[in-house]
């Protein structure tokens, strides 16, 4: 696909190549889209570099907002082809800024950007690692030393993720830009009508609803989530579980739900666009992840006033309100069960001022990002 050309002369909008990998409508791509919707697009435009050739749920919105989409060969299929396509698109578009969100894998598109003579190359850390995911960890550890090699600038969603990828010294030198996983506090807010609508849609009007939003992947720990819920249901037949998302382990989790004989009270929704409504419908957001950077859905949940139970491996920076409680990942299933049961009558309370004051309001955060890109672009004219 042809990409709009751009030079280092001051022209607007400045087009930034956003390398997001797979678009799965959660996590990284959700964060980038939140910024894209709220950034001043007369000054900054995003072009999205995605792995895979299939149409995604965000394609149409990107095009409507003036962005461009460059589909790439998935790196799992051929890293060589993926990098060649990146290099060609970076060159054709004459980008001045490439912003890669692939954590340790950012070294590959940023090397392609270096070859294409892109002057500003941003490596962005969104996550960390887990002891149990040993095969992927080997690759992450092997690539981590190269995370800074081809980047000119560093960004992270939290100090924790910055330290993991770039090291403490880089943070101490003030070289890492903190870009928070900000949310739209006008969209993610208490909504009783939305709560009633979702509960009626699933026939759960008077039930204790445990909710989870995330990819069906090793990181998210769905097996523990489902086993804990099965015990919750046995002790409280009024409980129900809603799982939003898709992923490579979905079939396995469906089989586990069947094995545990809880199919009637576990609902798989696939990908949904009405996330604010679901968060309003839940009684508790359950996130027993093996590891997390800064889960944007955790910020969204707090914005609507939803109590959150998370594993203690989730970065503590996520707790921007008193709504978040961390629990030991390796606690026993009975311990997890009793803790989750305690949320049936937990009080919902929004803390909009805390979300805003913590820097997680997208309206302010998007303007900060816009100014940062402009300052990077302006610095080229001084060389």
Name the predicted role of every residue range.
Residues 100-106, 125:
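Short His-centered aromatic/hydrophobic patch
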Residues 29-34, 208, 212-231, 248-254:
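A conserved mid-protein helix/loop that constitutes part of the nucleotide-sugar donor-binding site
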Residues 271, 290:
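Aromatic "clamp/platform" in nucleotide-sugar-dependent glycosyltransferases that forms part
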Residues 150-189:
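A short, active-site helix/loop in glycosyltransferases that binds the activated sugar's phosphate group
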Residues 49-50, 307-311, 316:
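Short hydrophobic beta-strand element within catalytic cores of glycosyltransferases
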């Amino acid at each position: 696909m042809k990409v709009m050309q751009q030079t280092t002369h001051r022209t607007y909008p400045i087009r930034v190549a956003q390398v997001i990998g797979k678009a799965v409508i959660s996590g990284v791509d959700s964060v980038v889209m939140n910024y894209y919707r709220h950034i001043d697009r007369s000054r900054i435009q995003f072009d999205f570099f995605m792995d895979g050739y299939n149409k995604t749920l965000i394609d149409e919105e990107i095009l409507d907002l003036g962005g461009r989409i460059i589909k790439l060969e998935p790196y799992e299929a051929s890293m060589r082809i993926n990098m060649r396509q990146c290099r060609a698109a970076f060159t054709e578009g004459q980008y001045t800024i490439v912003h890669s969100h692939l954590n340790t894998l950012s070294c590959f598109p940023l090397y392609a950007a270096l070859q294409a003579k892109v002057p500003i190359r941003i490596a962005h850390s969104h996550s960390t690692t887990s002891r149990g995911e040993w095969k992927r960890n080997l690759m992450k550890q092997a690539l981590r030393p190269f995370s800074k090699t081809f980047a000119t600038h560093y960004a992270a969603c939290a100090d924790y993720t910055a330290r993991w990828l770039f090291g403490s010294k880089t943070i101490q030198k003030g070289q890492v830009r903190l870009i928070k996983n900000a949310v739209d506090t006008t969209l993610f807010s208490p909504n009783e009508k939305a709560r009633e609508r979702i509960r009626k849609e699933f026939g759960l009007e008077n039930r204790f609803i445990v909710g989870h939003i995330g990819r069906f992947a090793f990181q998210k720990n769905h097996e523990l989530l489902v086993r804990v819920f099965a015990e919750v249901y046995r002790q409280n037949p009024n409980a129900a579980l809603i799982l939003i998302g898709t992923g490579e382990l979905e079939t396995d989790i469906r089989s586990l739900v069947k094995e545990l004989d809880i199919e009637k009270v576990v609902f798989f929704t696939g990908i949904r666009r009405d996330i604010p409504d679901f968060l309003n419908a839940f009684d508790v957001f359950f996130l027993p992840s093996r590891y997390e950077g800064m889960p944007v859905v955790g910020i969204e949940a707090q914005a609507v006033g939803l109590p959150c139970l998370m594993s203690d491996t989730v970065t503590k920076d996520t707790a921007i309100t008193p709504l978040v409680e961390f629990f030991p990942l390796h606690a026993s299933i009975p311990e997890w069960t009793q803790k989750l049961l305690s949320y049936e009558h937990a009080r919902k309370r929004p803390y909009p001022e805390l979300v805003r004051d913590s820097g997680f309001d997208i309206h302010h955060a998007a303007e900060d990002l816009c100014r940062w890109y402009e300052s990077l672009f302006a610095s080229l004219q001084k060389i």
